[in-house]
């Protein structure tokens, strides 16, 4: 984008990244928001339980997985991170309504902030999309995108065919302008 004024660059950046404020971002693209507040640092023995629960879920041993998640949540009941993980296991078990309840609680506990909160918003947004509840999905993806999630931003673009078409056309034009 050599030869473009700062104003032109700001307009192009806004077109390619519609959730970015007008002008260049203060943060590098790879920046993902993390929470400086207490991020549910789990005791090592609770982390071990969660890891075992995840392995069981991946092996489709759901009964044991959910027993382990319940045990972990008994020891850390306010952990949005554990709720996120259990929601993912519930989705693998095709128990979407229960997963949605865990994600609601994870968002409430985290207030949608920090790594666990953003992950809960993204997971809930994806689940809403799966359930054909696009308005709810969009709300969650907007919140997560504003918090810095590039995944949420990509989902918003994917949900807006007009924006995706415009972005594709602009990329083609700029690639042709920069030459082979």
Predicted regions and their residues:
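Alpha-helical tetratricopeptide repeat
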Residues: 1-180
């Amino acid at each position: 984008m050599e030869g473009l004024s700062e104003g032109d660059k700001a307009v192009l950046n806004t077109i390619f990244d519609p959730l970015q404020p007008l002008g260049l971002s203060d943060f590098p693209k790879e920046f993902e928001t993390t929470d400086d507040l207490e991020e549910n640092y789990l005791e090592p023995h609770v982390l071990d339980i969660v890891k075992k629960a995840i392995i069981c879920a991946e092996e489709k041993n759901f009964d044991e997985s959910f027993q382990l998640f319940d045990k972990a949540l008994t020891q850390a009941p306010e952990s949005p991170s554990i709720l996120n993980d259990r929601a993912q296991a519930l989705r693998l078990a095709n128990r979407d309504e229960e997963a949605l309840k865990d994600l609601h609680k994870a968002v409430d506990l985290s207030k949608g902030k920090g790594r666990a909160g953003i992950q809960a918003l993204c997971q809930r947004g994806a689940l809403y999309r799966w359930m054909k509840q696009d308005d709810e999905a969009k709300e969650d993806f907007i919140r997560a995108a504003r918090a810095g999630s590039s995944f949420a931003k990509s989902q918003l673009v994917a949900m807006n065919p007009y924006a995706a078409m415009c972005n594709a056309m602009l990329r083609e034009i700029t690639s042709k302008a920069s030459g082979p």
